[in-house]
Amino acid sequence: MHNLFDLIIIGCGGVGSAAAYYAAERGLRVLALERFEAVHARGSSHGDTRVIRQAYFEHPDYVPLLKRAYALWEQLEQRISRQLFYPTGLVEVGPESGVLMQGVRQSAAMHQLPLAEIARGEFKDRFPGFVLPEDCVAVFESNAGFLLVEECIRHYIGEAQRLGADLRFNQPVRGWSVQRDEICITTDSEKFYAPRLVVAAGAWANEVLADLGLPLHVLRKHLHWYPVKTPTAYGLQNHSPTFFYETSAGYFYGFPVLNERGLKVAQHSGGTTVQDPLKVDRSVDVAELEQVDRFLRAHLPDVAIPATDHAVCMYTMTPDEHFIIDQHFVHPQIAIAAGLSGHGFKFASVLGESLVQLAIDGKTSIPLEFLSLRRFDCPSYRSGCTLRRDLG
């Protein structure tokens, strides 16, 4: 039966492409279905770069995952003989008692991670072009940096295909059903069957998994690129760091100048609700752009305003802004990644590996209980789920 597989994956973005690779590496017959073209710009994983860091202010329980993620990214680089991770270091700036500083220091202390306190007197010399506000302190995480987001996905796709995975693009899933030990996936043109399923549908998770009543909402987020006032300002070749600021106006982050697009910067906080991910407004949000401009004037004075390029991506948020990595309540042969809440791509390697383990083995090599869906009071957890889900 040519449409029978060991594992089917819904979604082939960052996490889905990694899952396809790690499933194929295990020798499984794997099919991945993606609603758009390969390495597209209509979801959450595009825009040149993504931050990767280990002293995780969000929660120290992420650190074991991050250590494995780093190892897997390095293995992928070795396999393809290409650099994907740029260890620029990360300068983090915020109030002494703020969420950022307290969280970073806690994770670094608990997991013995390198984290340098930057004295005010040395900040300007060490990080030219950056401003340390009077009410803030700074730390530097030397083993942090950024990933080339599209290149990571492109190479996971390519390596999965080289190992025999069947990856199909422009194939939105229209429905799925479970009959005894078999899962049937329906697209516009075909039906596919497998005993195991991974769902990594990004902003479409609530559509694909509507039976679970996941507590998710999607936000529209903006990425901006700016020219710089001098050719050497904030340049990757000049060892400029990746950066993250906590300010009274929210969280802002950015990257060294990587290419002709200029310096990329974005506001991590905020965002506007998306009702339909297929119809997201991709125009510039003028009010949000003004906030980014104000941040740059105050903290990166060698950036030339206005911005010259812009892109929109989506965050799929949970109520507590932590991931959902779990098995389906009724069908444990279905593994789910959802609600990565705007900080998930750095984990794509390890989440892909873990989802395959969860679907095939029923357990993961790294503890993920703190990301269980059971922490939420979901309708499906209270009353059970239907055995069929048809999508419009």
Placement of each model-derived feature along the sequence:
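Flavin (FAD/FMN) cofactor-binding and adjacent substrate-gating region
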Residues: 75, 95-169, 175-181
